[in-house]
Design a protein with these regions (language model features):
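Nucleic-acid endonuclease domains
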Residues: 2-253
Length: 253
């Protein structure tokens, strides 16, 4: 007698949502493959996604944008890639380091190295001040933003950045020269320090082409809840590139 038991079809397993961190790992692996160098650490993501990006990233090599390098991103290192020997490529501004930044969607934010997701104590150490409480640090940041901004700029733009946006498939090689005259801008905050519980964004006041003044958000500061001790600082990168365009050279890959 035949077995009349039927095999039920296996339900489709929903595809896991790709996190921003996963996008970053895939992007770094694609840079490694473009240079033909080992990826520093375990890699458990889609090699097919890596292979889609690698041909465009080979322009880093063929266009002499950044020299031969090694992947140095593990264990919280400051730089994602470090050049072999001194100096950099013709587009590297003489830096021996390269940062890889990514976002899933256009209009995203990028964090500075070292202080972008640090403990408040580390943030204060970099500023040369004593840490007391989050409330006092919020007040200090808002009262001394022209001291804070150069430090954040340095930890973000002191080396070239290769920046990838997944949804638009956009890859840009970004180098900065000098820094803005922060004292020439007027600033406003979305929340003053006494009303700042989670996050507050810094806006600069600029004039548009018609001479009208408007506020543009360039930076977000976030203090996490008690379950997480670190703070987060992120540039609104597309607006930063536009508002301070005179300080950037951008190459589309």
């Amino acid at each position: 007698m035949e077995d009349e038991t039927t095999t039920q079809p296996t339900p489709d397993v929903p595809k896991a949502t790709l996190k921003t961190e996963d996008t970053g790992k895939i992007f770094e692996k694609a840079i490694c493959d473009a240079y033909g160098i080992p990826y520093d650490g375990p890699f458990q993501y889609s090699q097919a996604d890596v292979d889609n990006l690698t041909p465009r990233l080979k322009r880093l090599v063929t266009d002499n944008l950044f020299p031969a390098c090694v992947h140095t991103a593990s264990k919280g290192a400051r730089y994602d890639f470090t050049a072999l020997g001194s100096g950099g490529g013709s587009g590297s501004g003489g830096s021996g380091h390269l940062s890889a930044k990514s976002n899933k969607k256009k209009g995203g934010k990028i964090a500075p190295q070292v202080v972008g997701q640090s403990h408040p104590q580390k943030f204060c150490q970099e500023l040369g001040i004593e840490y007391t409480t989050p409330e006092n640090l919020k007040q200090y940041i808002q009262a001394n933003i022209m001291t804070v901004l150069p430090m954040l700029w340095k930890y973000t733009f002191d080396s070239p950045i290769v920046y990838y946006v997944k949804d638009t498939n956009d890859i840009r090689f970004i180098t900065a020269s000098g820094s803005p005259d922060w004292s020439s801008f007027q600033y406003v905050w979305t929340r003053t320090h006494d009303k700042w519980t989670n996050s507050s964004s810094l806006k600069v006041i600029i004039e548009d082409g018609c001479g009208k003044r408007k506020e543009e958000s360039i930076l977000e500061f976030q203090f996490h809840t008690k379950s997480r001790q670190n703070m987060a600082v992120r540039w609104t990168i597309d607006k930063v590139l536009r508002i301070f365009s005179g300080h950037f050279t951008v190459v589309s890959l």
